[in-house]
């Protein structure tokens, strides 16, 4: 299964720089508002039906007793390096999806995990239970976390019609259809509610 996925994904990834240079990709921008606004920054906007890409490696760091960033957006098949640039040992685990526990690791050590299921993964530390972050696994790399004002941009989207979805740690909004044209930015806003 993974090899057939790679046969489809690798050509798409190899074509993306050429499409980008020729102005043959578009983007999606928008704003998300939330009622209540408390959890707005725990929001990801993503394409549900975009084609997958070749796996990447991204990083989630630990500094000053915090996960950085608080939300890391990855695609199905990506590997995350969990770094420890703190002065104390940490443990990283998630009870969600394909639950995992990476064990305890000292400062300057790292662990990795490859995500094969789409969805949110709460990141916790058994040594410091007040710490919290999320890894959101999207079906493709066409996804983005919102900023503090709820704005987002999904770049390098091949032209086509898609289903745009939003995930939030506590709130919901219905999916929206979106059409992306080459060299243009499509716009889609969301209102999150309980």
Each language-model region and where it sits:
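Bacterial N-terminal signal peptides that target proteins for export
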Residues: 1-10
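Bacterial N-terminal signal peptides
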Residues: 9-20
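Extracytoplasmic copper-binding redox domains, predominantly the cupredoxin/blue-copper superfamily
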Residues: 22-194
């Amino acid at each position: 299964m993974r090899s057939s996925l790679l046969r489809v994904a690798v050509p798409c990834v190899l074509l993306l720089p050429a499409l980008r240079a020729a102005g043959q990709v578009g983007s999606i921008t928008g704003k998300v508002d939330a009622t209540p606004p408390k959890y707005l920054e725990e929001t990801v906007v993503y394409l549900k039906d975009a084609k997958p890409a070749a796996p990447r490696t991204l990083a989630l760091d630990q500094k000053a007793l915090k996960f950085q960033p608080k939300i890391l957006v990855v695609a199905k098949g990506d590997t995350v390096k969990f770094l420890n640039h703190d002065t104390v040992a940490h443990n990283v685990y998630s009870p969600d999806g394909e639950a995992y526990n990476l064990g305890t690791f000292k400062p300057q050590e790292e662990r990795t995990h490859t995500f094969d299921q789409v969805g949110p993964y709460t990141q916790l530390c058994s040594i410091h239970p007040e710490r919290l972050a999320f890894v959101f696994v999207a079906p493709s790399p066409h996804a983005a976390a919102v900023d503090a004002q709820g704005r987002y941009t999904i770049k390098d989207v091949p032209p086509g019609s898609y289903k745009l979805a939003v995930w939030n740690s506590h709130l919901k909004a219905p999916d929206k259809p979106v059409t992306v044209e080459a060299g243009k930015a499509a716009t889609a806003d969301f209102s999150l509610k309980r």
